[in-house]
Amino acid sequence: TLGNERLALVGESGSGKSMTARALMGLVRKPGVVSAERLEVLGRDVLTLSARGWRALRGNDIAMVLQDPRYALNPVQSIQTQLEEALTLHQRLSRRARAEAVKDAIAAVGLDLPVLSRYPGELSGGMGQRVMIALALLNNPKVLIADEPTSALDARLRNQILELLVEQSAQRQMAMLLISHDLPLVAAHCDRVLVMYQGRQVDEMPARALPSATHPYTRTLWTCRPNAHTYGQMLPTLDRTQDFTETAHGDR
């Protein structure tokens, strides 16, 4: 259940984080199958939605920021064209109102108006990610899914982008699902954490409790991070002989 909060989904590569996000967005392609009795998004069972129902929901009530703008943005269309296209899919606006909405969206993510005339290949990684966020927020969604939005950025830009997402989610009273490998960022910017292993949730906790996690899988994820104190030392690794899906009493 996702309330009006910032929920993080963490786990090693292949644990099912991005696939969970794709299921929520209706983007699991055949032969993939989503198996559940119900899968509710904003009170609607999305497993029963028609293609028309998905078009109304996706990009409007629920939106997604992907990992890399180089692959998510259209390389042969200007930023303004892509933003206006996202608006016309969900709103009927005059040309003037559409232009104003696009300018407001760009300003909200800290970019200057000349960016609108540029193409994705002319943008830096940080600028491209801000454009992706502007696209996702354009129709004021109630839920934002951010799938590794900082993975291609350096440490300084990672913090800037996460702070922008937190600021926008608070201003818009918008729920956010953040998928990330960066546990310190999650601990600093999120409210709650779900930990996934082999396609299953094995742990749940307040984000601030990550450094003191007791579940063996979560604890290893936290301690295997390199830092200044572990320079030159062998980092802990996961004990693959242990069944992490068998959670201890009190863990979920």
Predicted regions and their residues:
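Short catalytic/signature loops enriched in Gly
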Residues: 6, 116, 204-252
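ABC ATPase NBD coupling module
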Residues: 33, 46-63, 81, 89, ...
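Conserved ABC ATPase signature
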Residues: 119-123, 127
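A short, surface-exposed alpha-helical micro-motif characterized by mixed small hydrophobic
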Residues: 186-188
